Amino acid sequence: MEAGGFLDSLIYGACVVFTLGMFSAGLSDLRHMRMTRSVDNVQFLPFLTTEVNNLGWLSYGALKGDRILIVVNTVGAALQTLYILAYLHYCPRKRVVLLQTATLLGVLLLGYGYFWLLVPNPEARLQLLGLFCSVFTISMYLSPLADLAKVIQTKSTQCLSYPLTIATVLTSASWCLYGFRLRVPYIMVSNFPGIVTSFIRFWLFWKYPQEQDRNYWFLQT
């Protein structure tokens, strides 16, 4: 029991540390927006989809009584809100950003209404909410595949972040172990694609190293 308790504590701690580290990756974009007073080279949709993902898992954690999920996703949602507000402040096309935000939050509210009004059984609600969160998380991990195809076409990994890739694989692996230990398939399955896509990125970094890209740029200039 003591060994199992220590292992559980280690996994829980890894989930918190690695996930918060991954969410904090947006701080570099926040610093860039403040310094340049623009949103050049900053993508908005990752902030928005991560916000919705955090709110979904926060609801799941609250319904299940999982303190780890509650803490991690509360901090994550707060950080994503900060990034979204900063982007909105510096973005010249605020109408498009507001429309995207309202649309996705509207979908989230409709989901909440469905789960809490039309699914009265708490256990059934928990299962359906877990399924919804899993599908959304998997779609988040698979959405950058278009960028990976672009890397292969251009033979350049400049659009990829190596630190974020490390954070993603560590976070995904931690949550897979967390889901396995607690026997929660929604958490385990939804994070497995994060491991797969991260290793694809590692292969691309090995295949098309960024140092090579910089040397090529210097030769051209």
Curated annotation (Swiss-Prot):
PANTHER family xrefs: RAG1-ACTIVATING PROTEIN 1, SUGAR TRANSPORTER SWEET1
Coiled-coil residue spans: none
Organism: Papio anubis (Olive baboon)
Molecular function as annotated in GO: sugar transmembrane transporter activity
Species classification: Eukaryota, Metazoa, Chordata, Craniata, Vertebrata
Localization in the cell: Golgi apparatus membrane; Cell membrane
Gene3D superfamilies per record: 1.20.1280.290
The name this protein goes by in its record: Sugar transporter SWEET1
Gene Ontology CC annotations of this record: endomembrane system; Golgi membrane; plasma membrane
Main subcellular localisation: Golgi
UniProt-listed Pfam families: MtN3_slv
Region annotation Mediates interaction with TRPV2: where it falls in the sequence: 149-221
